[in-house]
Amino acid sequence: MAMKSLSFLAVLSLLALTLPLAIASDPSQLQDFCVSANTSANGVFVNGKFCKDPKLVTADDFFFSGLQTARPITSPVGSTVTAVNVNNLLGLNTLGISLVRIDYAVNGQNPPHTHPRATEILVVEQGTLLVGFVTSNPDNRLFSKVLNEGDVFVFPEGLIHFQANIGKAPAVAFAALSSQNPGVITIANTVFGANPAINPTILAKAFQLNPRVVMDLQTKFKK
């Protein structure tokens, strides 16, 4: 009896340790697919989205067109991201993956940011990029590499990373992310463009800056 109790406790402990790993990413699907539906009509509620009735699903629900064309670059950082996720490709719902195209102007960058729910794997299609990510505290170690056409680099989930065009011509990259909705937290926009604004005194102390400099940055990033 004592041995059975010990075995039960061992199994229970193992489950307790593995459960956080099991829920650390998008949940596994319980059916072949769950095409997201915009309304509850003819649908069921699964994983945060209404699922379209499988009998009404068509090939178009798994199709997106648009990554073949570069979008205009109008951002001050000199890059444009075209995302394909569950919001514009409904068939991605529950499948745990998404895709982006990133266009970089000369000297443009995709500034330091994180994806709170996804690992990213990036391949350069055109140009030369300087890429990198920084590990968590206390080491804050930088892993950086220069990528040319056809080169691939991985950014671990949740870590701050960036890409910068260091070539003499525009650059293009494609990236896959391990979530249907990976999320993006751009560090500068989040810290200095928070709504409502973070108290400048707090940021001045955190960044060792004059409060006036912080207020100037907050003005620049104000939405």
Swiss-Prot record:
Disulfide bonds join 34-51. Mn(2+) binds at residues 113, 115, 120, 161. It comes from the Eukaryota. Keywords: Apoplast, Disulfide bond, Glycoprotein, Manganese, Metal-binding, Secreted, Signal. Residues 65-215 form the Cupin type-1 domain. May play a role in plant defense. Probably has no oxalate oxidase activity even if the active site is conserved. Oligomer (believed to be a pentamer but probably hexamer). This is Germin-like protein subfamily 1 member 11. It comes from Arabidopsis thaliana.
